[in-house]
């Protein structure tokens, strides 16, 4: 195996990852090509069985594990909250071989689907997280509750970074798509209340540097307001006006 670190404890897990996966005490995800399991006090993710396009990407852009590791490192350096990635590796000299990623195990964290708490506060924190993500030049094409962990103190963390892209200045259309997608998939009930949407959008725009109330509302209302998740927010503001 070729690993990204020299730490003996991590290298030991990557020397024979299949054996460790086979004896894992807990499987978080098993979808054939992608397996996520608890291994030696860490979370291991394995990608395997991908076809020609993925092999081409591996040749020119690195394995899925390497790309996820680089993405997590970039997010950490940008100050965007994510689960620490510790190492990654793949079988040397084997075309299409599985690749493996080791991450920290946050035992007390839950994904957003299972989280229970103050929805207004969470909407605000999610707005800040996604706003910072965009402000630092990243987008995530698969924002959804299962790709967000929440720590015991209520801090949301991005996980599953396959959909992460570094694009430099984020186009407004892409930013709106990310915001609306997360709004559509947020904690049940499926749609945001006017207060939750307002908290989300205001904190999002504050993180983007849109300082004035008029500024952030002008930027997002016209496009996000066309979607079901934000229509109630627009109607509520018109009523108050």
Predicted regions and their residues:
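C-lobe/activation-segment region of protein kinase-like
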Residues: 157-235
């Amino acid at each position: 195996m070729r690993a990204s670190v020299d730490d003996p404890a991590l290298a030991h897990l990557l020397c024979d990852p299949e054996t460790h996966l086979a004896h894992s005490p807990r499987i978080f995800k098993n979808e054939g090509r992608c397996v996520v399991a608890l291994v030696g006090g860490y979370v291991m993710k394995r990608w395997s069985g991908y076809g020609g396009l993925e092999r081409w990407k591996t040749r020119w852009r690195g394995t899925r594990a390497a790309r996820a590791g680089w993405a997590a490192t970039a997010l950490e350096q940008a100050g965007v909250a994510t689960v620490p990635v510790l190492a990654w590796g793949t079988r040397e000299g084997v075309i299409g071989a599985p690749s493996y990623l080791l991450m920290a195990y946050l035992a007390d964290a839950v994904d957003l689907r299972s989280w229970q708490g103050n929805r207004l506060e969470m909407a605000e924190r999610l707005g800040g997280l996604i706003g910072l993500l965009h402000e630092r030049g990243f987008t995530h094409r698969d924002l959804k509750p299962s790709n967000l962990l929440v720590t015991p103190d209520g801090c949301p963390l991005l996980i599953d970074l396959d959909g992460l892209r570094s694009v430099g200045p984020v186009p407004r259309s892409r930013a709106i798509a990310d915001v609306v997608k997360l709004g559509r998939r947020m904690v049940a009930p499926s749609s945001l209340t006017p207060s939750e949407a307002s908290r989300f959008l205001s904190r999002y725009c504050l993180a983007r540097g849109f300082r004035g109330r008029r500024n952030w509302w002008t930027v997002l209302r016209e496009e996000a307001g066309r979607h079901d998740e934000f229509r109630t927010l627009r109607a509520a503001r018109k009523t108050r006006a």
